[in-house]
Amino acid sequence: MTQTVPYRCGRIAVIGRPNVGKSTLTNALVGTKISIVSNRPQTTRHRLLGIATFPEGQIILVDTPGLHREQKHPMNRLMNRTARGSLEDVDAALLVTESTHWNEEDTLAYNLLNDTGIPVVLVINKIDRFKDKSALLPFLTHINENHTFATIHPVSALKRKGLKTLVSDLLALLPEGGPMFSEDEITDRSQRFLASELVREQVMRQLGKELPYATTVEIEYFTENTGLFRIGALIWVERESQKAIVIGKGGVRLKEIGVKARQQMERLFQTKVFLETWVRVRKDWSNNEAALKTFGYE
């Protein structure tokens, strides 16, 4: 007699310091891009649910901003609060770190998770950088000797390596029960939100080094017609000089941001997109908690 494997469903927080690949991992597990990615800190600023549905169960991933030790900047404080708040009502957590690199921010994240009492799975990301995987052994030994995890998984989120076993172990940590979302849902966020993030992703990719804190994106309009989405996006900066940087000489940079964001939207929304972009100034918005809330930062 064949024994039926029970269906499992639950929420798992994705926690870690900036730039270790949390959003790339979330995208890989969900199977499509819902979280924006760049090599700049503060790329992820909001809590976002990624819904990964499998025959055996449904994993609801709570993608979070990176944890920062430096909290002088209001944006960092806000993102730390968002990350900590994401640990409420989760069944387990993924602590994502970078292969062979463990620093004080990793320890901060580990201690935060250790205090919750929930099962914690360590994901050692970016192992594709190593041709000889035995180079990871000293790091794995150090981790095992000094920390306690439910399981440890070396993976490459970018190359989607090592994810099958990770999914199996994550499902085993979840309670039995039916799915919380339908099979075709991939996130709890609206298309309007995703559009703003895709524009901000291109700003971060092209200007993150020059304007690390100073930009955010607000959707002015979002209309859906058969076969076409019309979207207007405002890119907010803090100085007139920054506005000039975003626009670029002859508007070239702003046009490039718009073209690449539109291409990403068409891929995600599976329809043609007409995208307009503008740049506006609101002085020192990222240092003002009231302004942060106005722009949707929790």
Curated annotation (Swiss-Prot):
InterPro entries assigned to the protein according to its UniProt record, in alphabetical order: G_ERA_dom, GTP-bd, GTPase_Era-like, KH_dom-like_a/b, KH_dom_type_2, KH_sf_prok-type, P-loop_NTPase, Small_GTP-bd
Record GO biological process: ribosomal small subunit assembly
Binding site for GTP: 16-23, 63-67, 125-128
One Pfam match: MMR_HSR1
All copies of domain KH type-2, residue ranges: 199-283
Chain positions covered by the region annotation G3: 63-66
Region (G1): 16-23
Domain Era-type G span(s) in chain numbering: 8-176
Entry-linked CDD domains: Era (cd04163), KH-II_Era (cd22534)
Segments of this protein annotated with the region G5: 155-157
Region G4, annotated ranges: 125-128
GO MF term list: GTP binding; GTPase activity; ribosomal small subunit binding; small ribosomal subunit rRNA binding
Main location group: cytoplasm
Role this protein plays: An essential GTPase that binds both GDP and GTP, with rapid nucleotide exchange. Plays a role in 16S rRNA processing and 30S ribosomal subunit biogenesis and possibly also in cell cycle regulation and energy metabolism.
SUBUNIT field: Monomer.
Protein name: GTPase Era
